[in-house]
């Protein structure tokens, strides 16, 4: 029988053959070392099935003696961003950026001043803005995110993200990253996994800060993407202009499509929080071998927000986690992360 090595390099054969390890104090030391190792990996997690699922997955897929071993080149993990890696309520961060960009856009195009939905945004009436339709928001996004050189967009987005603060915490949006998920990113990378963001948000927008905030380089961000047009400036220097042409809608089925297009491998692990992530988790779970699929359930109104409507939580238009999705997670053996019960703390500043 082949000896199976444990996480500390101690296999069954050496355990049974080493007299020193048969003593109670020695066994207690081994048990204590295992517990300390587990707690040190993702310390912002409470002990429980969710934490254990992550640790068991990493141990099994990185242990060469395990039948579940995954070669390093196949170790890919994908993460949704909004509601999975950082706060998405009361509104998606990029949508807020676009709304705040409207005055600058109207200053360049005065003809938009009396046109809807720009007129409503300029009024500052939050109640009226909350009633804007999806078509209205799409029109605002096109006006504020396209028609400019890529470098200009990046500069404007960077300037905004470095100063914009959340209305509840009065902190930068980039400070409202879930510490438990940051630890998972780091834990996976420490064990040879490449981590990717696969988001319904704008690909170029997230790439502005992904390296600094998540340790994920821009080339490992897959998001909703618009076209670009090649051209030359007055001095003959080549540049790209962002065009109002949708290339990839990275929501729902667009997520596995984007993964295939831009990554080229099926993930071994996938993390999300809403119906828009369902197909990414399905696609991940349909592969051979060991897989890890996890969904964050926002059930902590005291520390963050509570919304579903799964399990009787309040309904929402932002990051909906439906009962149907919850039931599928149970059926397909995905792990549901309870923000309230599984996370010791939410943010690094706590």
Task: Locate each region found by the language model.
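A metal-dependent, Asp-based hydrolase signature
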Residues: 91-175, 179
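Asp-based phosphoryl-transfer active-site loop
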Residues: 75-89, 281
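ATP-binding/phosphotransfer module of carbohydrate and carboxylate kinases, centering on a glycine-rich
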Residues: 15-16
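C-terminal cap/substrate-recognition subdomain and adjoining C-terminal extension
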Residues: 3, 19, 36-41, 45, ...
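Mature N-terminal segment immediately following signal peptide/propeptide cleavage
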Residues: 40-81
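N-terminal secretory signal peptides
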Residues: 1-11, 23-28
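Short, solvent-exposed loop/turn elements at domain surfaces
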Residues: 63-65, 86-88, 230-231
